[in-house]
């Protein structure tokens, strides 16, 4: 977004902005037909054009978010980065639309006398105010959706991390038993049974594998 200042004179309307807005005003000049003998209708049509630009962009963000959030479990970090960018844009839109709506509503207040309005102009201002409020409501709804998606993604990531840590812990315990048995029987210590024969070797291997399997089975089942 970029700020625009409207200067309304008796014979002309002037817009001033820090950035070139050819993409906004050139289609307006080419396609919109509006009487220029009165400043109020021209100003309101220009505001309507700006509002339509916001409506188009918010609708595009809504479509892209609906497509990206069909499966929360398969969201990627890139999707979360995109949502953060959407959040920034939506907050910028709110920062622009809320003051604009306030200024429009003030034109209806005869105490301020900001702009001479006829009855049809007042109806157009009211319609624009309603449309702006709808866009504001949609922006706030999308921001809530982004917050919910990020919370859900964080919960999914926490669950995956806990599952990974549990599996690693079980694997560590399972590998500890064969290592411990190998260390014990590898010591130069006399045992009451033969530890040098082939049968003793396979017995130790069998006990190690059985113990590791039982521990893994127990902790994998205990969730």
PLM features: what roles do these ranges have?
Residues 130-223:
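Hydrophobic alpha-helical transmembrane segments and their immediately adjacent juxtamembrane loops
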Residues 2-156:
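Extended amphipathic alpha-helical scaffolding segments in membrane-proximal extra-membrane regions
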């Amino acid at each position: 977004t970029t700020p625009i200042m409207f200067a309304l004179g008796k014979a002309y309307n002037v817009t001033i902005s820090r950035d070139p807005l050819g993409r906004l005003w050139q289609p307006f000049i080419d396609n919109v037909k509006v009487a220029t003998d009165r400043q109020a209708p021209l100003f309101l049509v220009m505001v309507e054009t700006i509002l339509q630009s916001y409506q188009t962009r918010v609708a595009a963000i809504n479509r892209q978010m609906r497509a990206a959030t069909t499966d929360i479990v398969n969201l990627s970090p890139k999707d979360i980065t995109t949502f953060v960018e959407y959040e920034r844009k939506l907050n910028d839109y709110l920062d622009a639309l809320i003051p604009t709506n306030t200024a429009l509503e003030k034109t209806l207040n005869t105490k301020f006398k900001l702009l001479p309005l006829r009855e049809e102009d007042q109806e157009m201002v009211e319609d624009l105010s309603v449309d702006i409020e709808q866009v504001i409501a949609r922006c706030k709804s999308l921001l809530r959706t982004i917050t919910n998606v990020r919370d859900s993604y964080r919960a999914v990531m926490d669950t995956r991390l806990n599952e990974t840590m549990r599996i690693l812990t079980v694997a560590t315990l399972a590998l500890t038993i064969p290592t411990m048995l190998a260390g014990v029987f590898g010591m130069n210590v006399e045992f009451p049974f033969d530890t040098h024969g082939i049968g003793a070797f396979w017995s130790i291997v069998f006990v190690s594998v059985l113990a590791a399997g039982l521990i893994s089975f127990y902790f994998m089942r205990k969730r």
